[in-house]
Amino acid sequence: MKKNNFGFTLIELLAVVLMIGILTSVALPQYRRSVQRAEAMEALVNLKTIFDSAKRYRAANSDTPGSLKGLDVQFFDADPNSSDPIIGNFRYAIKPTHIGACRVDGKAHSTYTDTYCLVMMYKETINGTTYRDLLKCNTGSEKWKYVCESLAQSCTNGNTAKSGTTYYISDKVVCD
């Protein structure tokens, strides 16, 4: 009488588990980077929204806003009276010369360790040329360098528009 054995051997199961582990180890870092780039894009959209609203505020009041209060935008998770509200994973700074968004380590601590910042300048002079509404990304951390590089403008010569640790996102910056 012939005996039929159905099922998998231990070796076959171990091989499948090993393959799943290898695929996960390759895919997980890419997934994490995609999530971080998406967070940066969300901050970029929020930053541009606040910046445009601040420009309208300046035009109407001949002054720069000191907080979100008085602007024609609202963020449900932000304190409108704060000059540096936290929205999502970013702390926004509303200053007379610029509006910035720095990635913070968490709402509880809100520290600026090992991070990057997106900055919208009302006006900045670079190499004798004055630019208005200049958008840039600053990082001193190798860990976050790829975020700034992925957001930065590409020059016609294939280089990234940057100066030191500052990456220019605005298409107004002339590439070297």
Model-inferred region functions:
Residues K2-Q30, S34-V35, A43-N46:
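N-terminal single-pass transmembrane signal-anchor helix
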Residues S25, R33-V73:
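Conserved hydrophobic/amphipathic alpha-helical signal-anchor segments
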Residues M1-K3, L18, A40, L44, ...:
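Short, contiguous, well-ordered secondary-structure segments
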Residues F6-F8, F51, F75-F76, F90:
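Phenylalanine-focused residue identity feature
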Residues A60-D176:
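Periplasmic/extracellular, small/polar-rich flexible segments of pilin-like filament-forming proteins
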